[in-house]
């Protein structure tokens, strides 16, 4: 009897492993899924830099159910001669695997080109066999008006902090002018971009999509040109897309989506503004428009985060909770937080990684993706950079995360 009780209350403390050996190459922005047969698939981008590196490719690896280690990396996607970045994996309710990623056509943030592939043949060894690949161009609703509303609100939201560094105002002005396809501005600009193409391009994925209560798939997209985010929707497995209105809130990017039982869609974002707090937006129409914007009382060092809803109904978030200006590298601590009220408060916090190595060594643990597998375990894949780089995989259960009084 005591043995049974012990099993019922057993706690799985964090365990971890490297997906591949540490190496000098840049390995970043991991995404992870569980396949219908119980394997784990992870994807990331690999190369020597970011948008200026035309050798960047999307790599992947597989951990077969019951295996002790990950497979050797394989190529998931590659547009030769273009930098491929920000892969996002997702398995939909029909059991199809999806991959989104971007290529920088002219090595600029204005020319990020969003692509999408789907596969029903991905359970064997090696890379998925893609049934089809498509390109996604956006037509953001009311973009000039959104940018004007954003500009009108920055003083009220940020006060003098908004002009604490010139980059905030410069990015805002650039986004406003690009939203209006200002031909004079474009003629004077020294980078290759043409008018409305920036509105159609420049939007990137980072966090996994969700399936809305109405059955549509929704993915958060963001732009470093407009310094904001929007939602993309598909009801046919990614063959056709529609897009909501961008958020009129400066600096909320890389949105991680979750939907409450009452239908409210919540987006948690990286902070590209001056406050260095986790940003939040709420929508009453499933991401078509966004009405409420506020900050969590959790620091964010301009770094990505991830959210998922657990089978218990509780929400889990993986994030860096430093501000990046306190003498430590902002991404040198990674934490898991638990919400028991659908993301309104986050009262449980556990540290997953913590390095006090001097900032000049740039240790970081960042860009996480979190999922829960069918056995109840919580899995996190993230960039792991003590000195060289790899992708790290960590797993634990909700009981371990819940078994803490407040923040550590």
Map each language-model feature to its residues.
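Sec-dependent signal peptide recognition
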Residues: 1-7
